[in-house]
């Protein structure tokens, strides 16, 4: 089974449990806390990925981390399950899938807006409002600046790309001129 399929299966199960209890946001925060601890410590990552450490030692370390973070029983049990089934190395992908499912559940999209020049807040708000009206969902916009675009904006929503950059327009003109 592919890593992506594994991640989606575990993430979907945790989102369903969170949705039943109204704790999806809480679970998301707790998963982020835990992954932050792992990402901040190469030695912890090494321990959990090294088969030389026994499962009991890993369980004790995991239990200690979960206690210090004050994780809910559901998230703690979920992490314990991942450890038992040797799925902890997939945690970053699981968290990414979890957040995606949670966004779908709550009607949130997270597009990326890339512009050639820094945009004013009023322009960002106008684009955000347009996206909200077009999609009917809450928009959490990530804004980036890429000077290579020269001007205009590129908006990415999931797999869809809306490219209104001058760079792309110039490339199209160049292509037309070359073809004659």
From Swiss-Prot:
Q: Which UniProt keywords apply?
A: ATP synthesis, Cell inner membrane, Cell membrane, CF(1), Hydrogen ion transport, Ion transport, Membrane, Transport
Concerning InterPro entries, the annotation shows: ATP_synth_OSCP/delta_N_sf (IPR026015), ATPase_OSCP/dsu (IPR000711)
Looking at the UniProt record for this protein, which Gene Ontology cellular component terms does it annotate, in alphabetical order? plasma membrane; proton-transporting ATP synthase complex
User: Which is an annotated Pfam family here?
Assistant: OSCP
Membrane topology recorded in Swiss-Prot or TrEMBL = Peripheral membrane protein
Q: Which SUPFAM superfamilies match?
A: N-terminal domain of the delta subunit of the F1F0-ATP synthase
Q: Which Gene3D superfamilies match?
A: N-terminal domain of the delta subunit of the F1F0-ATP synthase
Q: Please list the GO terms describing molecular function.
A: proton-transporting ATP synthase activity, rotational mechanism
Localization per Swiss-Prot or TrEMBL: Cell inner membrane
Its main subcellular localisation, reduced to a broad class, is membrane
**What family, per the record?**
Belongs to the ATPase delta chain family.
What is the role of this chain? Answer: F(1)F(0) ATP synthase produces ATP from ADP in the presence of a proton or sodium gradient. F-type ATPases consist of two structural domains, F(1) containing the extramembraneous catalytic core and F(0) containing the membrane proton channel, linked together by a central stalk and a peripheral stalk. During catalysis, ATP synthesis in the catalytic domain of F(1) is coupled via a rotary mechanism of the central stalk subunits to proton translocation. This protein is part of the stalk that links CF(0) to CF(1). It either transmits conformational changes from CF(0) to CF(1) or is implicated in proton conduction.
How it assembles, according to the record, is: F-type ATPases have 2 components, F(1) - the catalytic core - and F(0) - the membrane proton channel. F(1) has five subunits: alpha(3), beta(3), gamma(1), delta(1), epsilon(1). F(0) has three main subunits: a(1), b(2) and c(10-14). The alpha and beta chains form an alternating ring which encloses part of the gamma chain. F(1) is attached to F(0) by a central stalk formed by the gamma and epsilon chains, while a peripheral stalk is formed by the delta and b chains.
Q: Which NCBIfam families match?
A: ATP_synt_delta, PRK05758.2-2
Know the name of this protein? ATP synthase subunit delta
Q: Give the species this sequence originates from.
A: Geotalea daltonii (strain DSM 22248 / JCM 15807 / FRC-32)
Q: What is the lineage of its organism?
A: Bacteria, Pseudomonadati, Thermodesulfobacteriota, Desulfuromonadia, Geobacterales
Q: Which gene encodes it?
A: atpH
């Amino acid at each position: 089974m592919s890593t992506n399929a594994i991640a989606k299966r575990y993430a979907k199960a945790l989102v369903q449990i969170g949705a039943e209890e109204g704790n999806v946001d809480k679970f998301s925060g707790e998963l982020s806390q835990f992954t932050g601890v792992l990402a901040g410590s190469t030695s912890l990552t090494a321990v959990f990925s090294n088969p030389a450490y026994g499962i009991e030692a890993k369980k004790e370390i995991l239990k200690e981390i979960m206690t210090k973070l004050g994780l809910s029983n559901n998230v703690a049990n979920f992490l314990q399950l991942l450890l038992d089934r040797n799925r902890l190395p997939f945690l970053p992908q699981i968290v990414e899938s979890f957040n995606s499912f949670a966004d779908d559940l709550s009607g949130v999209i997270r597009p990326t807006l890339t512009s050639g020049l820094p945009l004013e807040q009023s322009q960002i708000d106008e684009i955000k409002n347009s996206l909200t009206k077009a999609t009917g969902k809450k928009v959490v916009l990530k804004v980036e600046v890429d000077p290579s675009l020269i001007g205009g904006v590129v908006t990415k929503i999931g797999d869809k790309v809306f490219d209104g950059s001058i760079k792309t327009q110039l490339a199209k003109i160049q292509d037309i001129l070359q073809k004659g």
